């Protein structure tokens, strides 16, 4: 399936369904294993509170840094793992906030950057991303849209 981004560019997208938090984590791990992410990529996670953004991140980080313990960076704003930075933008309200946490400095490095609550910073950001939209169907099931705008 293809969708159009805001600038009218057609991007590749796929829809997946998971039936548990563990399946969401495994799904992300398998995407990484299938080379869907590489150094320098920006992964834009979108979804409501409790949708599974951190579970997705756990799977992705488990592939790149298997010994890491992944937690949500809600209060720290960023957690760093081997070759992966995990930002939580829930409390970010302005471009000045992004500057104060050194966010833009990290874009020039070769880490994979995972951004929870990407919609909060989309207006300050024009990089191409791998977009992951996670929607809660019920308590356990999730609909995940993988959209790649890098090409």
Please state what every model-predicted region is.
Residues 46-48:
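P-loop (Walker A) phosphate-binding loop of NTP-binding proteins
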Residues 66-81:
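Short beta-strand-centered segment that lines the nucleotide-binding/catalytic pocket of NTP-utilizing
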Residues 33-39:
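Phosphate-binding P-loop
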Residues 42-44:
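Short hydrophobic/aromatic beta-strand immediately N-terminal to the Walker A/P-loop
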Residues 2, 6, 14, 62, ...:
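Short phosphate-coordinating micro-motif centered on Lys-Gly-acidic
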Residues 80-106:
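Mid-chain, well-packed structural core segment of small domains
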Residues 8-30:
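N-terminal pre-Walker A segment at the start of P-loop NTPase domains
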Residues 53:
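Conserved lysine of the Walker
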């Amino acid at each position: 399936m293809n969708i159009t981004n805001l600038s009218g560019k057609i991007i590749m997208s796929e829809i997946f369904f998971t039936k548990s938090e563990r399946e969401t984590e495994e799904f992300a791990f398998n995407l990484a294993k299938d080379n869907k992410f590489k150094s320098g990529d920006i992964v834009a996670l979108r979804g409501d509170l409790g949708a599974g953004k951190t579970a997705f991140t756990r799977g992705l980080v488990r592939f790149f840094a298997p010994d890491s313990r992944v937690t949500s960076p809600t209060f720290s704003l960023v957690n760093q793992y081997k070759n992966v930075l995990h930002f939580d933008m829930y409390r970010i309200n302005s471009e000045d906030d992004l500057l104060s946490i050194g966010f833009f400095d990290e874009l020039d490095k070769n880490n994979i950057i995972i951004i929870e609550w990407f919609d909060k910073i989309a207006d300050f950001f024009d990089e191409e991303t791998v977009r992951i939209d996670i929607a809660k169907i019920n308590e356990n099931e999730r609909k995940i849209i993988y959209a790649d705008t890098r090409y």
